[in-house]
Amino acid sequence: MTNLPSLSQLEESVHDALNQRLKKEIIQSGGSISFSLLMDIVLYDEEHGYYTGYKEQFGEPGDFITAPMISNIFSRCFLNSFKENFVHLPSSILELGAGNGQFAVDLLIAAEKNNILIDRYLIYEISNNLVKRQQKIMQKELSNEFFSKVEWVSEVPEKFEGIIFANEFLDAFPTNIYEIKNKQIFERKVGIENNQLDWKEDDKPNLELAGIIDTENLPTGYIFEYSKNLDEWLNKFFKIIKKAMIFFVDYGFCQNELFHQDRTEGTLMCHYKHHAHANPFAFLGAQDITWHINFSHISRLAKIAGCKVSGFVSQANFLINAGALDFLSEHDPNNISDFKIQTNAFQRLTSPAEMGDLIKVIGIAKNTDVSLLGFNKNDRKLQL
């Protein structure tokens, strides 16, 4: 924590306001609250929340950079896969949580340039602040014709048919934190210690999770995340869509990788001014809080809902399968400055040391045939 930047005066006032609200919630709840409630408040509070308040989250002035911001290769590769799936589906796209809007901008520009029909581009976004930013960049970058195809929705449309895409959407759902002790599961709640927010272990083991998580080989002290909020949202989501190919892109693992004896401290991560750390009680409302997705669990929920898992690959494999090297080859190596920028961007997207292996792509189909472009090599769905 000592190497992290200092809060601005505005950020300090936001932190203090959220800190007081959380302490009040803890006192009113008898001494502790779930971590998911803390996460919900600090990320989504109407006035002070990280995503819903004043904060600039993305790019150099923000706290982190997402894949679409690195290069339009990312969006163009997904458009290649979407185009193949439009053979079986209406030419409509629903993006869940569009961030700063860069993915939609790059995809729609490429679609117009290559005469790929897009009937509608829907964006599901709960943050009015982000909607305004997305509208601003799209109105600036898109032609009038393609901007007119974009529509913002506050609920996932029932009986939607088309492509559904989500990049770093699942890991923003509030999650609870749990710890293994003598093969039993205890929730790590949030309490007050010495007038500061701190972890507080629940007194009783969580029997509900015992039937979901196999704790037999997990050591005492092992920490993990589980989001009932995400489960409930996905169960409803899979039920209401009618016919779709779904692409979830996020940091995460198969269950056997996630629940490994060497991964004992959980995956909770905070980002502030491009610094990563693991203290969720610092910089309230000024930092992002995320966790890594259990893709095996996502797969199970999808199958229970009658969907089919079409593929599961690393981001690097998806992009290369879907044409990233072809897009890179469009740039002239003799233009040293431009080519260096493009190759560096490609490395960030595909390198195992960067996003390439840490981020995964899962394809889920409901009531449709699918094209496997993006998943056609190095598919790991059998490991889920």
Stretches found by the model and what they are:
Residues F165-G211, Q261-H271:
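A mobile, often basic/glycine-rich helix-loop segment
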Residues G211-L384:
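Long, Lys/Arg- and hydrophobic-enriched amphipathic alpha-helices
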Residues Y51, A172-T175, E257, S371-L373:
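Short helix/loop capping segments that flank catalytic or ligand/cofactor-binding pockets
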